[in-house]
Amino acid sequence: MAKKCAISGKGPMSGNNVSHAKNRTKRRFLLNLRTVRIALDDGTTRKIKISARELRTLKKNS
């Protein structure tokens, strides 16, 4: 499965590792993904991967 949030569609970002000598190498900033079970309208449940921020939003608004 892709490293993307199923709700917001956010994916990993790219950036740099910066050493003390200011040498830069490329790196990826990954999401804090969590696997949760979501109840659908027809009564079934489904596992999806969502970011921790979206999980907070779901808990706040439900």
From Swiss-Prot:
Sequence similarity: Belongs to the bacterial ribosomal protein bL28 family.
Gene encoding the protein: rpmB
Positions of region (Disordered): 1-22
Organism, scientific name: Sulfurimonas denitrificans (strain ATCC 33889 / DSM 1251)
A biological process from GO: translation
Signal sequence range: none
A GO CC annotation given for this chain: ribosome
Protein name: Large ribosomal subunit protein bL28
Pfam families given in the database record: Ribosomal_L28
UniProt-listed Gene3D superfamilies: Ribosomal protein L28/L24 (2.30.170.40)
GO MF, one example: structural constituent of ribosome
Keywords per UniProt: Ribonucleoprotein, Ribosomal protein
Domain of life: Bacteria
PANTHER family xrefs: 50S RIBOSOMAL PROTEIN L28, LARGE RIBOSOMAL SUBUNIT PROTEIN BL28A
